[in-house]
Amino acid sequence: MTFIQQLEHAWAAGNTLLQVGLDPDPQRFPRELEGKPDAIFQFCREIVDATAPYACSFKPQIAYFAAHRAEDQLEALCAHIRAAHPHLPIVLDAKRGDIGTTAEHYAREAYERYGAHAMTVNPYMGLDSVEPYLGWKDRGVIVLCRTSNPGGSDLQFLKLDNGEPLYLHVAGMVADKWNADGQCGLVVGATFPNELAAVRQRIGDAMPLLVPGIGAQGGDVTATVNAGRNAAGTGMMINSSRAILYASGGDDWRQAAADAARDLRDAINGVR
């Protein structure tokens, strides 16, 4: 089963477009995990198990693990997701942007070491920075397009000679040239619903969108769903991280995360 097929199955089986982001910050962990050498793994595992009924995918951010020398805990976490929740794809958020053999090794890291089903990549160096990942025909390649951060406008909103903004040119290039085998998706932030709608119109219904920016970054659920959904009412992985992970710092942190995920899933479904 390819990444896209797995994602489509998860949308349908769980009736959900919610993606749970895994950005573990040990300073915000519950007290019961203090001093444990594998606290990052334990925290993320419990979050995964609590929120899996409401998720269509999980997105671990690699820097949150690497900064604590916890890549082995990321390996263990990905193995746990594949074993306990095999229907839910793992999107490794790494935003890699190199070329050639370096990119090939990044692909091996994501797809072999961690067993991710997809990963985020940066297209700034052109096709050379994306092509090595496309060689893994059953995996997904999620290309940065219109990111949720305000500074993204410094480059992404620049106009080409034909008047088209750069982010929309990237969307069209991925859809028309790089997605021949149906592996690609795009990252488009919830904080820019007009641009999100423009991207969906440009690429059509087939390509999934990873949509960060809901929750702590201020993206609006109604505007996001209306702008980004496809004709089937799916087509998106709407990501939330901190609002779910740290819904409570008390003893009820597992249930609080589950409740936050369920509530956001229901809010999304109330629109689509």
From Swiss-Prot:
Catalytic activity from the UniProt record: orotidine 5'-phosphate + H(+) = UMP + CO2
EC annotation from Swiss-Prot or TrEMBL: 4.1.1.23
Active site: K95 (proton donor)
SMART domains, per the entry: OMPdecase
Biological processes, Gene Ontology terms: 'de novo' pyrimidine nucleobase biosynthetic process; 'de novo' UMP biosynthetic process
Broadest EC class assigned to this enzyme: lyase
CDD domains linked: OMP_decarboxylase_like (cd04725)
Keyword list, A-Z: Decarboxylase, Lyase, Pyrimidine biosynthesis
Record-linked Pfam families: OMPdecase
Sample GO molecular function, one term: orotidine-5'-phosphate decarboxylase activity
Pathway entry: Pyrimidine metabolism; UMP biosynthesis via de novo pathway; UMP from orotate: step 2/2
InterPro entries per record: Aldolase_TIM, OMPdecase_AS, OMPdecase_type-2, OMPdeCOase_dom, RibuloseP-bd_barrel
Family (UniProt): Belongs to the OMP decarboxylase family. Type 2 subfamily.
Protein name (record): Orotidine 5'-phosphate decarboxylase
Organism: Bordetella petrii (strain ATCC BAA-461 / DSM 12804 / CCUG 43448)
Lineage: Bacteria, Pseudomonadati, Pseudomonadota, Betaproteobacteria, Burkholderiales
